[in-house]
């Protein structure tokens, strides 16, 4: 049943999606999938989540690998979140984790053939239990943050919001810790520019950065990402305004295909 649900959800967020309906229930608070030895008995394995996301942990990282990754020597243990589809959902999910430091965030060009990214996040911890818990927490929030990801065979849209950004979002996107933070993502990239313009005109927000295919911010993916902060209500309103415009534009590229949330919209 879980495999069936995953297939349905991924149909909505990856390039090769079609007419599959989105599941009716929210996965926002669901426990991480696959945390049992039936799927993988290795001690490094923590679990999986949508977007072909896998959670891993290394209790005592080899010294040479530790050094090459440039991780603070005090962190003997690391937690890893890696995926094929999505960067925003996993990064916002990782922002919920505590008692660890985010040592690395990289967004490879991926989306399994689509227009966007995959993601690699590494947590550092002095105790392996903290590293494992950080990965478990992040996995449990991935489904929620796919709630405002929309896609068809022509491209995708992504909208993320938090009322209070923490250190993962600061490291990844330059968010102000403790303040409301939002992002809009549009692919093809021209749609992303319209989303940024719409968000800025919808409410009074403070832009932080814009990532385009060639300015080093998107690993040359065919999308534009807009990052901003401000009053919580304004940030939320800016995202809602951009979302309405973006869905109309992306739908125009493939009018016959559904354009629905991957899980349940949360903004």
Describe each region flagged by the PLM:
Residues 2-86, 108-118, 126-127, 146, ...:
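A structural signal for small-residue-enriched, beta-sheet-centric alpha/beta enzyme cores
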Residues 80, 84-98:
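N-terminal low-complexity, intrinsically disordered segments
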Residues 93-97, 138, 195-199:
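Buried hydrophobic packing segments
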Residues 99-100, 127:
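A glycine- and small-aliphatic-rich helix-loop capping segment at beta-alpha/alpha-beta transitions
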Residues 121:
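Long, structured ligand/cofactor-binding scaffold of large enzymes
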Residues 133-141, 238-245:
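Short amphipathic alpha-helices in soluble, non-transmembrane regions
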């Amino acid at each position: 049943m879980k495999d069936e649900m995953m297939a349905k959800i991924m149909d909505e967020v990856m390039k090769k999606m079609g007419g599959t309906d989105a599941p009716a229930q929210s996965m926002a608070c669901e426990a991480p999938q696959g945390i049992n030895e039936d799927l993988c008995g290795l001690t490094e394995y923590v679990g999986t989540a949508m977007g072909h996301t896998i959670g891993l942990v290394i209790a005592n990282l080899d010294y040479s690998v530790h050094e090459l990754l440039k991780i603070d020597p005090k962190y003997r243990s690391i937690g890893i979140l890696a995926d094929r589809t999505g960067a925003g959902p996993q990064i916002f999910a990782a922002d919920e984790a505590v008692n660890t430091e985010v040592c690395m965030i990289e967004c490879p060009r991926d989306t399994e053939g689509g227009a966007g990214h995959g993601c690699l996040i590494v947590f550092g911890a002095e105790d392996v239990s903290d590293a494992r818990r950080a990965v478990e927490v992040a996995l449990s929030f991935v489904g929620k943050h796919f709630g405002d990801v929309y896609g068809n065979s022509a491209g995708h849209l992504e909208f993320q919001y938090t009322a209070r950004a923490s250190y993962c979002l600061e490291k990844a996107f330059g968010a102000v810790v403790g303040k409301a933070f939002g992002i809009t993502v549009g692919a093809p990239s021209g749609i992303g520019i319209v989303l940024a313009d719409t968000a800025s005109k919808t409410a009074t927000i403070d832009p932080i950065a814009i990532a385009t295919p060639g300015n080093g911010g998107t690993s040359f993916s065919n999308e534009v990402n807009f990052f901003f902060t401000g009053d919580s209500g304004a940030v939320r309103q800016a995202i809602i305004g951009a979302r309405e415009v973006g869905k109309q534009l992306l739908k125009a590229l493939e009018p016959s295909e559904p354009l629905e949330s991957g899980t349940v919209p949360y903004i």
